[in-house]
Amino acid sequence: MRVCVTGFNVDAVRAVAIEETVSQVTGVHAVHAYPRTASVVIWYSPELGDTAAVLSAITKAQHVPAELVPARAPHSAGVRGVGVVRKITGGIRRMLSRPPGVDKPLKASRCGGRPRGPVRGSASWPGEQNRRERRTWLPRVWLALPLGLLALGSSMFFGAYPWAGWLAFAATLPVQFVAGWPILRGAVQQARALTSNMDTLIALGTLTAFVYSTYQLFAGGPLFFDTSALIIAFVVLGRHLEARATGKASEAISKLLELGAKEATLLVDGQELLVPVDQVQVGDLVRVRPGEKIPVDGEVTDGRAAVDESMLTGESVPVEKTAGDRVAGATVNLDGLLTVRATAVGADTALAQIVRLVEQAQGDKAPVQRLADRVSAVFVPAVIGVAVATFAGWTLIAANPVAGMTAAVAVLIIACPCALGLATPTAIMVGTGRGAELGILVKGGEVLEASKKIDTVVFDKTGTLTRARMRVTDVIAGQRRQPDQVLRLAAAVESGSEHPIGAAIVAAAHERGLAIPAANAFTAVAGHGVRAQVNGGPVVVGRRKLVDEQHLVLPDHLAAAAVEQEERGRTAVFVGQDGQVVGVLAVADTVKDDAADVVGRLHAMGLQVAMITGDNARTAAAIAKQVGIEKVLAEVLPQDKVAEVRRLQDQGRVVAMVGDGVNDAPALVQADLGIAIGTGTDVAIEASDITLMSGRLDGVVRAIELSRQTLRTIYQNLGWAFGYNTAAIPLAALGALNPVVAGAAMGFSSVSVVTNSLRLRRFGRDGRTA
C-alpha cells in the first residue's frame, strides 16, 4: 500500500516516527517513508492488516515528540535495491491528504488494482498531490495580498484618522488566521512535539507584530498590522510559487507512471479479451498490435515487429523483436503483430523498478546535506535567541523598544530556513528525474558525492567495450587433422556451455553444416574452459592456462598461430585430445563504435581508464590499443575482479567500475561507483550505483557528468542558502531591513534555490550539460 502524506516533506524525523509507529500495526511487515516525496510504502498482509489502523498510525506519528524518535535515518535512505518489493502480499494505493483546518485524514480512496498484488494506481500521482498543494496556497494568496495592501494603505494614507487602525486590524485578522492558518497550525504541531521549524519563525514573527499592534490599538501607540499582513502575504505567495516549482521538479515519476499501458488484449482460449492491465498475470498471453504499448514484461511467442524502447534505454532506434526475444512493458510496438507471454507484471516489471529506483533516489540525501541538517537542528532556537537579544539590545541600549520589536520580527522572518530545506532535495529530485528520462538511473545522494571523487574508470571488456557477439574467424588444425574435425570436437564440448565463446563455436559448426557428435560428462573450469567425453574419450576446449594445467603437448606451429591471432586482438581457444593440442580456434568480438570516443572523453575529464578481462595479455592489449586504454588488467578470473578493484583502491585510487551487471556484480559493489550498462535486470539494479538502460557507452560519460552537475547544483544551493542567512540576519538585527522586505526576500530565496535546481532539466539538451 502506498500512502501520500502532506506535512513532513522536509522532515526526516517525522519519517522515522511514521516508520516506527506504523510498523507496530498488526499485519505490517515493513514500512519505508520517503520524506522528500511525501510518501509511505507499507508491505502488509491484507488478511491480517487493517487499512484504517495504518492510516490512523500515520496520523498519530505526526505528533510523536522528537526526543522519543530513534536517532536514525529513514529506512528508505538505506534501500539498495528493489528485491523487497517482491515480498508484497497485497494492497491498494491510498491517498491521504490533510487540508488546512482538517484534523482528521480524509477517507482513503481506492486508486485501482486488485487485492492479489501491488498496483501502480492512477498515473496522476504524485502530480495530483502537487496540484492539491497549489490549491492549498493559491486561494490564500488571493486573500492575503489585497487585504495586506489594504492594511498598508490604511496606515500610509489614512493614519491620521482614528478608524484607520481598526480598518488595518479588520484587514489583518483574516490574513493572520485564515491565510496564515497552515503556518500557525504547523508551528503548533512542532511545539507539541517540542521541536521547531520554519513555520515557528514565521508564526512567532507575525503573531508578535499582530498582538503588539492589537495592544497598541487600545494604548495609542504605533501599529504594525501591515507588517504582519504583508509578511504572511509574501510567505503564502512564496509557498505557492515553491509548490509550482517543486511540481516541475517532481514531474519525473508522474511521467514514468504515464508511460505504462492501461489495458491489455488478453488471449483466452483463442479469443481476445480487452482487460485492465492489472488483471494480467504471469504466464498469460497478450496480443499487441502496431502502435500499441506492450502492457507487461514478457517473451515474444509469435510474430515479428520493430519495438520502440526509447522509454527504457533512451535510444530512438527501434529494435527488431521475433519469437524468443524479451520485451518490456510500456515499450511501443511500431509495425507488427506480436503475441507475448507475460513474465513480469505489476510491481515486478522493469518500468515499476525504474519508478521505485527514481523515487528512492529522490527520497535520498547527499552526505553534503548532513552539515545542513546539523546546522538546521540548532538554527531555529538560535534565531529565536538572536531575536530576543535584538529586542533587548534596542530596548536597553538604544532605548527604542518599538525599533527593537521591528528588528526582532525582521530577524525571525529573514532567517526562515526554507531555502536551506529545499537546497538538496530539489536538486536531487530534478537531477535524478532528468537522468531517468535519459535512461540513467542514479541511486541518490551517496552516488552523487562518489562521482565527484572518482579518478579511475575500469571497464569490463566483454559486453561493455565490445558487443559480446563472438564469432569464429579462423580454425587452425594440427598435423593429420582437418579444420572441420577440430571444429566438430570443439562444438561437441561447448554444446553444454552457455559462454559466449562456446555459443560462437557451436554456431560456426552449424553454419558449416557439420554434424556435432554427442558429448557427456561436462565439467566447466571457471574462467579457463570446458572438459567433456566425446566418442568415449576426453576432449578439452579452453584457454592456454587450461592447456598447461592439463599438461597437454602444444605443437610449435599451433603455439605460433595462437600468438599471431592474439596479437590481432582475437581470443585463441585450444582444442585438446589424447594428451595433445589438435587445433586452435580464433574467436573475435567487435568493439563498440563509440568506445574510443568515450575513452577519449573520460581522459579529457582527467580520469585514468583501465580495462579488466579474462583474455590473455596480448589479446587484451590489442583491444585496449584499439580504444585508447593505457592500463590493462588481463587474465583475471570472474571471482578475482573484486580483488583487482580492491587493489586499485589500496593504491589510493577512487574507482568506478563499468560492467554488465551480471558476472560483474561483486566488482560493481566493491567499486566506489558501480555502473551497470546495457541492462535493466534486477541484478544490475541491485548491484550498481548507476544503471544505464542503454547499451551505449556514452551513457557512462553522461552519468558522471549529470551526477557531478547535480552535486554542483547542491553546493550552489547550500552556498546561497547559508550565505543569504549569514548576511541577512545581522542586517535585520541592526534595523536595516523592514520586516515586510524580509518576508519578500525570504520567499525570493526559496524560489531562487528551486529555480537553480530546475536548470538541471536542460542537461543533455543541444549539447549542454546544464
From Swiss-Prot:
Region listing for Disordered, in residue ranges: 103-130
Major location category of this protein: membrane
GO CC terms: membrane; peptidoglycan-based cell wall; plasma membrane
GO molecular function: ATP binding; ATP hydrolysis activity; copper ion binding; P-type divalent copper transporter activity; P-type monovalent copper transporter activity
Biased composition (Low complexity): 110-121
Domain named HMA: residues: 1-66
The keyword Magnesium is annotated on this UniProt entry: yes
Locations listed in the record: Cell membrane
Induction, as annotated: Induced by copper ions via CsoR.
Reported consequences of knocking out the gene: Mutants show increased copper sensitivity.
Keywords: ATP-binding, Cell membrane, Copper, Copper transport, Ion transport, Magnesium, Membrane, Metal-binding, Nucleotide-binding, Translocase, Transmembrane, Transmembrane helix, Transport
Catalyzed reactions per annotation: Cu(+)(in) + ATP + H2O = Cu(+)(out) + ADP + phosphate + H(+)
InterPro entries in alphabetical order: ATPase_P-typ_cyto_dom_N, ATPase_P-typ_P_site, ATPase_P-typ_TM_dom_sf, ATPase_P-typ_transduc_dom_A_sf, HAD-like_sf, HAD_sf, HMA_dom, P-typ_ATPase_IB
Active site: residue positions: D460 (4-aspartylphosphate intermediate)
Function according to Swiss-Prot or TrEMBL: Necessary for copper homeostasis and likely functions as a copper exporter. Also required for full virulence.
Protein name in the entry: Probable copper-exporting P-type ATPase V
Organism annotation: Mycobacterium tuberculosis (strain ATCC 25618 / H37Rv)
